[in-house]
Structures are given as structure tokens and as C-alpha cells.
């Protein structure tokens, strides 16, 4: 069954087992009761498509797509509709019902577009925080890579308050001092942690990163560049209307990083809907100006 499904829609291991077959076929509408725990703000399909179209206009033609917390997979579906040379897709998601729904949506996409070229699609039911990317990194060495998505908009301390298991391993990620450094309890946004891990993964690759993040997270990443010197050639921020797109009262944007060797320390801010440049902020003569 899995071999047939892969020929039909590109998904490797469509069914994990017999139980998975029945749960996918008879999957009900998904209503999550733990959205707060997972910082779960799902990207609507129109926004995901608009983001992919923006990237395509900039000449981005990925051969490999990675979505670190893919949720319902709207970015994966949008990428399949937008880019014509995708060879492999990796989607990682902790909430299995979302993956089951995504599998059916991808199947429907290829049933509706039978002439479309098939990508090899790996949908992995895993927690990002204990997922090892190294075994798959060799498969995309030297290829054009796009990391895309909308990682959770929640802090680790908030997850700790509600006793969540969806936490990264304790580490001095934010270079905290004193007791916080010892206990690993320094507060930070989960999305920032995910973004930094993806930047490290993409170092030395031909790659772009496009993530929806809170503006405070983007500012932290730009501010950290003076010390980290990640190999980023260009940093761009496209402001979105989070209230309109997500019903969320928070300042948020699309962060677009072009990987390279320059160690960019300034961010160009644009309006997402018009692509009109607004201003630039970052490091100037050793001072962070925002």
C-alpha cells in the first residue's frame, strides 16, 4: 500500500501501520484543545501561497523544502503549488492528527493535478526538539534549500507554567548568567530557538529561510548577529497584519534570510502586502540601532 501511495502522491510511508490506515481514512475534523501549549497559530492557505509567490518572485527555486513544525502543512501545500523543481520535502510535526490530514490533502492535490511532477515527501511524526537532522543533511548537500514555516509563538517559561512536555532540552541557549544559566531556565521564545537551530543547519549551504515570527524574535536575531556572526548574506523583514491573518494581537512579520558568507548585521523592513521598503535597523558602528 505504501509503495502505491508513494507513486501516487510522493509521500514515503503514507501509512505507519494498519491502525494508521484506519485512523487516516476515518479521521474526523480536528479541533485542538491544547493550542496554548503548542503556540499553535496555523497559517491560512492564502497567506502561505502569498509567501511562496513572494519568494518565487525573488528568484528562489528550491530543490529541498524543510518545514520544522509543519502543522496542517499549508506551507507544504503552497510550495507544491508554487515551485516546479522540488525534489524532496521534509515536514516535522508533533501532533499526529495534523499529519494525517496533511497526507490526505497532498493526495488530493496530486489527484487534482495528475500531470504534476512528484516530489519525495517525508512527513515525520516527531518532536522538533529531539529530532536529529544530521542523517538527512547529506541528502540535500549542495542543493538549493528553503526552510519555511510558522514555528510556535510561545515562550519556554509559558510552557513550563502549564507543565508542557513540548520543550527544548535545557541549555544556555540565551547565554544567561548565574542561576538561570545553571538551571537552563532563561526565558526565550520557542520560535527563536527553532530559527537559530535552522540557521546552524543551513550554514555553508545554498539556502533561504522564511519564517513567520514575532517582531521581538526577529529583533533578537538581528541583535545577536554582532556576536554570533552567522553566515547570513541578507536579512529581510516583511511586516504582516497578525490580527487579520491570525486573530492575534501581536506584531509579527515574515523573516527572510539569505544564507551566505557576509555575516549581515542589518535588517531591511518592508510591507508584506506591497513589498514597499520602510526602513532599516541593526548594527551601526558597534551600536544596535532599532
Regions found by a protein language model. Give the residues of each.
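S-adenosyl-L-methionine
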Residues: 1-58, 108-135
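Signature of N6-adenine DNA methyltransferases within the class I
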Residues: 36-37, 41-50, 69-77, 86-89, ...
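Conserved class I S-adenosyl-L-methionine
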Residues: 62-69
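Gly/Ala-rich phosphate-binding loop of Rossmann-like dinucleotide-binding domains
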Residues: 80
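Conserved phosphotransfer cores of two-component systems
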Residues: 83
